[in-house]
């Protein structure tokens, strides 16, 4: 499955992001995340915000050798800046684990966006030592808000997942990446919903130098993720 497709696309390494969509599934999700982790696959675990043992599970995520934590506020039904998340974020920050958030709009919850860029900015302010990866350029279909609230924050990486199908203004794509700082941009796809074949042409049309494209497509990610291995 995944490794076969990576071979087809000529991709050496990838990141798999797992989501605990319910309390009772949390431990099994992280067991699976640990089972698929390999030299080629970095693997993020997850905790459910309503799990009574969420803090203990974060310790287990680290003990399992997982590479970070993934939240999807729409699937897990919480606002990213909810006060109940503070102990969880404090624990993640103390463990030094990077955390990825689905950010912005999602078709599962089209009328209620749980991770608006302004909400994510509050989290970044409250936990300045927590390394955050804002998926979908920090806010799917919320690109103007990304420019207003998120650009240039040193504890934030922006990934490019699922950008090509939604971002119509390619000049804004370049403006966001350069405005944030190319050392904190990570190429991503959101496979299987999008693929490198769909996302790479957008990056290639953006006018970056070969060295800049290398930083975005793999060097930044390697520097970030190898700190945990």
Task: Describe the residue ranges of each PLM region.
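Conserved, mostly hydrophobic/aromatic
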Residues: 6, 33, 61, 69, ...
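Conserved residues at the C-terminal ends of beta-strands
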Residues: 17, 72, 188
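Catalytic pocket-lining loop regions of alpha/beta-barrel enzymes
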Residues: 67-68, 81-186
């Amino acid at each position: 499955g995944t490794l076969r497709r990576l071979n087809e696309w000529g991709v050496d390494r990838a990141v798999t992001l797992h989501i605990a969509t319910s309390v009772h599934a949390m431990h099994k999700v992280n067991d699976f995340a640990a089972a698929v982790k390999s030299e080629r696959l970095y693997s993020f675990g997850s905790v459910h915000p309503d799990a009574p043992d969420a803090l203990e599970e974060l310790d287990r995520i680290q003990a399992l050798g997982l590479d970070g934590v993934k939240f999807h506020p729409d699937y897990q039904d919480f606002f990213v800046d909810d006060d109940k998340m503070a102990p969880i974020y404090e624990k993640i920050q103390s463990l030094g684990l990077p955390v990825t958030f689905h950010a912005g709009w999602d078709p599962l919850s089209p009328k209620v966006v749980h991770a608006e860029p302004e909400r994510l900015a509050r989290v970044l302010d409250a936990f300045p030592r927590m390394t955050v990866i804002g998926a979908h350029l920090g806010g799917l279909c919320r690109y103007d808000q990304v420019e207003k609230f998120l650009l240039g924050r040193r504890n934030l990486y922006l990934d490019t997942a699922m950008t090509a199908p939604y971002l119509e203004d390619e000049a804004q794509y370049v403006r966001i990446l350069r405005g944030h700082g190319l050392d904190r941009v990570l190429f991503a796809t959101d496979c299987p919903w999008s693929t490198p074949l769909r996302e790479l042409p957008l990056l290639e049309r953006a006018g970056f130098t070969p060295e800049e494209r290398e930083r975005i497509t793999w060097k930044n990610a390697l520097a970030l993720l190898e700190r945990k291995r």
